[in-house]
Amino acid sequence: MTSFRDKAILITGGAGFIGSEAVNQLLNEGAKVTVFDNFSSGKKHYLPKGNKKLRIIKGDITNERAVINVTKDQEIVLHLAALPFIPDSFYYPVDFFKVNTIGSMHVFWSAVKSKTVETVVNISTSEIYGSAQYTPMDENHPTSPYSTYAVSKLAADRAAFTLHKENGFPVVILRPFNTFGPRYTEPYIIPEIIGQILRGTKELNLGNVNSTRDFTFVSDTVKAMISAAKEKKAIGEIINIGSQNEIRIGDLVTKLSKIAKIKTKIKRDE
């Protein structure tokens, strides 16, 4: 497979949970990595120190000029920067469209105008599919987003494909399911369960524990991202990232309780 040694790679949202793992894997390949992050949720201490091939720039994808400047001379773009927390999208819908849709358009258009960008990997979300009409959910599953977050991400996907058709924009759309691993924090489901268990919560309050999720470890999600960036045949395609194995939230609680060696009870929804 293609080597990314000395490849100029931009990671928007590179100080986040998934982005920082991408930074580590790409630096291990010898790539020249630029992180572009506003540090609203990403952390500088997630990133390695003292690596001469790592450049960190504080900036926001809603700032078109800043995006143009940072995209210049890049060869690969991994676009992860987003507002990701679904409940917030119900209260701040305009902000979600400003960042997830308009901000993404800034990244896409800057790449189109660049003379050096070979591939943009846009990290979308499985949330755009809505409730499963069948399982496993494949790339042909109908899109039926139920949150402003999901709609804002789907709008960015559609914009990316329009640019691909009209301008030859070299984009790959990846739709991860539930990614977990180090630096994954509350209030997302796995750290939320672990947090409640370790705090000694008498009855874990998790909502509907009969719902199911497909979980992928963060290093595997990032490997898929890097593979997509290297594969020219992936350009213009949608690719789901998941394990094709689902687990009930209630069963997940049982597994985590056994690992922690702490007995737990679950508060049932009335």
What are the residue ranges of the model-derived segments?
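Generic structural signal for conserved hydrophobic packing positions in ordered secondary structure
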Residues: 39, 89, 193, 206-209
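Structured loop/turn residues at secondary-structure junctions
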Residues: 182-185, 244
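Heptad-repeat alpha-helical coiled-coil signaling segments
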Residues: 178, 184, 211-213
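Amphipathic alpha-helical segment in the mid-to-C-terminal domain
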Residues: 148, 186-187, 218, 249
